[in-house]
């Protein structure tokens, strides 16, 4: 049986805090003994990143990983098995250097955790960067993986987020700058020659937030193109890729934070409005295979011939080709908003419980937020759990607002094509 998000949070708190208290002195003792004989790495050579639960973060951390790579570090990554595919979009980390943990059951979680701790020591990881925001589980993994240089976010004088004292380089988490800059701050701490309290006493310019583009396989691109044209033909829709526009609508968001969802009815109304403005263009409503019924409801309410249910029609590896063929995508604040950033696709991303100032896409994206006084209501301080059961922040975003931004993005796409 799969472990629910709330169960994970409860385990992290009620089990994680006592374990951090017990393990921290042991790790400190081991450090003290090792320091008698060796001084540890002069600079990171084998650098492990830990980010378990967020697929989008695998994209947002890529500039930081490439920064470390440019400094000569060999990269490793630990992630939940269900999220592993996100690391294949840019392939910054070698496949054989990716470790996974099965989060679908308690037994699988324990088994893979123990296996990882053995593997990390076998690979002689010398530096670990904990990317998670105050997770006790990842703090324990960081402390026990055998790395001498351990970097992560520390609460210092804050309250409620204590997770022991296993970090050797403690970084101040800044909730007022984009998460990618926070990740780059961790890289500075990992490679710094002198200890700072707190890390990182540097300025991170916007120019550092650079995202590489995915390498698109021409064969896969043609396969996706043919599949779309075949589906359109079967639905009696006149569509030729490159002639008519291809517009993507991604109406769902993960169960991790359902408050991020814009209403199904709004997406249906948006599809109707887009079709009225661009009657000859094809609209694909995307989603995973498990989201087929959710997507179908959006499609059936919209009742537009040129709008097709495309849920489950492409694999994860085929997303970059799909995005490359498309002109614009509208999505809730979820993985696709970040996955598409590795392609030239223009997006419109709807934010409510989160803020684009911290988690905005670093691609060709326009964010929309209602800027309510209560928003953002999820943060590192509450482990992204909100009491809200009425997402007015999303309800306040109108179809007209979104359509205006779609028009802007399509105009920009047309200019790029030379239309």
What are the residue ranges of the model-derived segments?
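Catalytic machinery of carbohydrate-active enzymes
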Residues: 1-419
